[in-house]
């Protein structure tokens, strides 16, 4: 099973809590994390893009770096690990993304990939006059399909003459063009999975629950059903937060403290911003992110326990049919990656030989 790290491009990582570690994003921090991940055999690093945060006492995600420029820097200071940036497709034309991908591929040949996101938080785009209107919630995958088509043509052939509703290319050219840039999509709704099966190479989905490592299995089944219709092979990667310590009790005490210290003002903002998109269906990523059960960490699957038990649960994840890998976040990234590499990974049968 492959292992990736979802690096903290925004302040405080993925814990919306006054009790969690409070820190600002920086190139130095992410360089330390990714170089450490490479040292311990991680397969890839991914950064998100966030253009407006949730506020609150912790100013959650009000401070963010930009994904492509950050990953270009990290590409230059690593040797093996794959590097994935996220394109906010409402802000970056596909031809510009293709040219940036060509540049980063020159820095790190064969190691770069692109995560495509449609955008769900209106405030991110409205602030700069780029929000297309409420119809975006229903039209977004039509838009993204055209975007991905243009991007694929430019990445694979260096030229596009695509003519569609949203994009019109006229002998648009990108050279040099990389030969094998992977595309990623994180949609988990039926519509999102259908898009992924048609246009992407990798699917990212949220794990579910606390210490329920196999609860996500249904999304793999739905992805396979969608991919069977397109005849394409799409790999499934699942997102989990790791909160580990020497004992189950110590790890659970941290998790309970994070939950007790939840930044309620920031969570209220998340709920408000997510509501229009969540209304599109219970299986959307946004509906899960904002669900009240564990919004403190955006409701991603959470594995809490001793190093031994976290290793065991990750092996259970690996055993779910269709799982190619996991994407990990940590409550404390520097210590978390170190402890994963030295205390968790050596106990995992699914990482034997790494």
Swiss-Prot record:
It catalyses: uracil + FMNH2 + NADH + O2 = (Z)-3-ureidoacrylate + FMN + NAD(+) + H2O + H(+); thymine + FMNH2 + NADH + O2 = (Z)-2-methylureidoacrylate + FMN + NAD(+) + H2O + H(+). InterPro entries: Luciferase-like_dom, Luciferase-like_sf, Pyrimidine_monooxygenase_RutA, SsuD_RutA_monooxygenase. GO terms for molecular function: alkanesulfonate monooxygenase activity; uracil oxygenase activity. The keyword Nucleotidyltransferase does not apply. Its EC number is 1.14.99.46. FMN binds at residues 49-50, 115, 124, 140-141, 189. Keywords: Flavoprotein, FMN, Monooxygenase, NADP, Oxidoreductase. One of its GO terms (biological process) is nitrogen utilization. PANTHER family: ALKANESULFONATE MONOOXYGENASE, ALKANESULFONATE MONOOXYGENASE-RELATED. Belongs to the NtaA/SnaA/DszA monooxygenase family. RutA subfamily. The FMN-N(5)-oxide reacts spontaneously with NADH to produce FMN. Requires the flavin reductase RutF to regenerate FMN in vivo. NCBIfam families: RutA. This is Pyrimidine monooxygenase RutA. The gene is rutA.
């Amino acid at each position: 099973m492959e292992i990736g790290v979802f690096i903290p491009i925004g302040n405080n990582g993925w814990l919306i809590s006054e009790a969690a570690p409070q820190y600002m994003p920086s190139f130095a921090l992410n360089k330390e994390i990714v170089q450490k991940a490479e040292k311990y055999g991680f397969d890839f690093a991914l950064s998100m893009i966030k253009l407006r945060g949730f506020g609150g006492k912790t100013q959650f995600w009000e401070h963010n770096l930009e994904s492509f420029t950050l990953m270009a820097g990290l590409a230059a200071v690593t040797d093996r690990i794959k590097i994935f940036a996220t394109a906010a497709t409402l802000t970056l034309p596909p031809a510009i993304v293709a040219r940036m991908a060509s540049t980063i591929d020159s820095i790190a040949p064969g190691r770069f990939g692109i995560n495509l996101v449609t955008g769900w938080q209106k405030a991110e785009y409205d602030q700069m006059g780029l929000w297309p209107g409420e119809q975006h919630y229903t039209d977004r995958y039509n838009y993204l399909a055209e975007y991905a088509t243009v991007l694929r043509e430019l990445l694979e052939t260096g030229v596009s003459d695509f003519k569609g509703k949203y994009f019109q290319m006229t002998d648009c050219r990108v050279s040099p063009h990389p030969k094998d840039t992977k595309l990623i999509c994180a949609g988990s709704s039926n519509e999102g999975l259908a898009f992924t099966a048609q246009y992407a190479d990798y699917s990212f989905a949220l794990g579910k629950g606390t210490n329920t490592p196999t609860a996500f299995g249904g999304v793999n089944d739905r992805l396979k059903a969608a991919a069977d219709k397109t005849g394409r092979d799409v790999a499934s990667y699942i997102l989990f937060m790791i909160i580990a310590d020497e004992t189950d009790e110590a790890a659970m005490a941290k998790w309970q403290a994070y939950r007790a210290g939840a930044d309620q003002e920031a969570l209220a903002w998340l709920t408000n911003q997510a509501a229009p998109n969540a209304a599109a269906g219970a299986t959307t990523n946004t509906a899960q992110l904002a669900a009240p059960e564990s919004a403190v960490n955006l409701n991603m699957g959470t594995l809490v326990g001793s190093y031994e038990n976290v290793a065991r649960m990750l092996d259970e994840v690996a055993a779910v049919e269709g799982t190619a890998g996991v994407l990990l976040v940590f409550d404390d990234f520097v210590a978390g990656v170190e402890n994963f590499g030295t205390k968790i990974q050596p106990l995992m049968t699914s990482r034997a030989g790494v």
